[in-house]
């Protein structure tokens, strides 16, 4: 199991060989100081993981996260810690996990004004075809919010997907928007 260190709101894999291994098994994380490596051998620095990626990898048994006191944070503890740091973590994590289980590569979508950028092949191999916004199915979305989501996805030439999470059943439903000229 790969050793990873919790540092605030990030998790670091200091060993470069272990970083390569994790990156090559699904494009997890980003190498410190290297943007969009095309090949795992391009990973020559430690790997930085988001909390969402770390929780997922811990649940899968691929990483062991250790805090500053040397305590191992099992999946449940790491999930609880992340919930305190990230707004709507439960919703975001549920969508992340669902997309990963469906075989997609899921990265942060912050620069696109979304929760996630989603790839079919991977970063560095293609531009992300989708931006995903995770929403509680019981949450109201105003027309203004919907239009602002759409503007960002349209200007970056990505398909906008709303991921609707039902907290009771833990199911995720997706709605994809297609913009047309009239």
UniProtKB/Swiss-Prot annotation:
SUPFAM superfamilies on file: tRNA-intron endonuclease catalytic domain-like, tRNA-intron endonuclease N-terminal domain-like
Pfam family, one: tRNA_int_endo_N
Enzyme class per UniProt: lyase
Database matches in InterPro entries: tRNA_endonuc-like_dom_sf, tRNA_intron_Endo_cat-like_sf, tRNA_intron_Endonuc_cat-like, tRNA_intron_Endonuc_N, tRNA_intron_Endonuc_N_sf, tRNA_splic, tRNA_splic_arch_short
An example Gene Ontology biological process: tRNA splicing, via endonucleolytic cleavage and ligation
EC number(s) reported in the record: 4.6.1.16
Molecular functions (GO terms): lyase activity; nucleic acid binding; tRNA-intron endonuclease activity
Cellular component GO terms held in the UniProt record: cytoplasm
Keyword line: Lyase, tRNA processing
Reactions that this protein is recorded to catalyse: pretRNA = a 3'-half-tRNA molecule with a 5'-OH end + a 5'-half-tRNA molecule with a 2',3'-cyclic phosphate end + an intron with a 2',3'-cyclic phosphate and a 5'-hydroxyl terminus
Active site: 119, 127, 158
Protein function: Endonuclease that removes tRNA introns. Cleaves pre-tRNA at the 5'- and 3'-splice sites to release the intron. The products are an intron and two tRNA half-molecules bearing 2',3' cyclic phosphate and 5'-OH termini. Recognizes a pseudosymmetric substrate in which 2 bulged loops of 3 bases are separated by a stem of 4 bp.
Similarity comment: Belongs to the tRNA-intron endonuclease family. Archaeal short subfamily.
NCBIfam families: endA (TIGR00324)
Record note on quaternary structure: Homotetramer; although the tetramer contains four active sites, only two participate in the cleavage. Therefore, it should be considered as a dimer of dimers.
Entry-linked HAMAP family: EndA_short
Protein name: tRNA-splicing endonuclease
Origin species: Saccharolobus islandicus (strain Y.N.15.51 / Yellowstone #2) (Sulfolobus islandicus)
